Design a protein with these regions (language model features):
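C-terminal all-alpha effector/ligand-binding and dimerization domain
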Residues: 6-155
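Short linear motifs at protein or domain termini
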Residues: 1-4
Length: 155
């Protein structure tokens, strides 16, 4: 449930924010809560953007923003290495959306184009969310496959 090691995040902006009501609902917190938002684009290579990602981390982890994109290490693993916070549970939601104008030009699509939005919430052993990533994939740039295997009882 993570991206290939062949992809890389490029940080576009990083800032401490108080989340608005819409963002709070999406990431599962209260409006006005303090988070550090890392706005980034995930690339397959230097020319092919796969998705726009807004990564929200707790304020005490904000200094990891400088480490994002140095290599292909996922953000939650950077937090684990730097702070010892281990992801014990990850919740993932997928839903359809449409891309905002501010992100469309970076992704090379028209504003309002359809997207697949994936929200991942990373929780520590106490159940506290320490990272939320909101990834927005323009149509045709992400495939999610699940294989289900039915076993028969031969009793």
């Amino acid at each position: 449930l993570q991206y290939s090691i062949d992809t890389r995040l490029k940080v576009e902006n990083s800032a401490s924010v108080e989340v608005d009501a819409k963002t709070a609902k999406m990431i599962g917190c209260d409006p006005g809560d303090a988070w550090h938002r890392i706005e980034s684009v995930r690339y397959l290579d230097e020319k092919s953007p796969i998705c726009w990602s807004d990564v929200y981390v707790r304020p005490e982890h904000q200094n990891i923003a400088d480490r994002i994109g140095e290599d292909t290490t996922p953000v939650f693993m950077v937090i684990e290495k730097e702070f010892g916070v281990v992801a014990e549970e990850v919740t993932m939601d997928l839903f359809a959306g449409s891309i905002e104008e501010s992100k469309a030009w970076v992704m090379g699509v028209k504003p309002g184009s359809p997207t697949l939005i994936i929200v991942r919430k990373y929780k520590d052993k106490t159940g506290r969310v320490f990272e939320v990533s909101v990834s927005e994939h323009p149509a045709g740039r992400f495939t999610f496959s699940i294989d289900l295997l039915r076993s028969s009882n031969s009793d």
